[in-house]
């Protein structure tokens, strides 16, 4: 199996996740080629069994570079894709001290739904989606993030 992994990491968290994913999949005999979206053309994707897209979340959306990359994507119809994002961890409300509920988080964190909409609009088929939380604006990644990446890798059929 061949996986092409496209990320838009700005502060290095996405690169860490991509490298960990590639390492986990290599142990299963899967080849993973990791690319930053600035280094490849959305119009000339290399052939692959699975395309994986990863973007950090900014203000609840994928960063602009990734949105533009996905809008200009020229992918084969019916190609399989997965999404693995890095998003800010929910912070307690300053007045009440309570963490937002999952419903409230889903209302404001729209990274995966926006990316899915763009990719399915390009004729691709979703295989899996997941997220790894970042504890600060520039990192670090949450404790136990490697286990999340491993579980995500397990969700992808080899």
Protein language model regions, located:
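FMN-binding flavodoxin-like domain, especially the glycine-rich phosphate-binding loop
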Residues: 16, 24-28, 33, 47-158
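Iron-sulfur (Fe-S) cluster-binding modules
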Residues: 1, 36
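Flexible, glycine-rich phosphate/dinucleotide-binding loops
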Residues: 12, 41, 90-92
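N-terminal beta1-alpha1 ligand-phosphate binding loop
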Residues: 2-28
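Short active-site-proximal "capping" loops at secondary-structure junctions
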Residues: 39-41, 58
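Cofactor-binding loop segments of dinucleotide-utilizing enzymes, especially the Rossmann-like FAD-
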Residues: 8-10, 37, 86
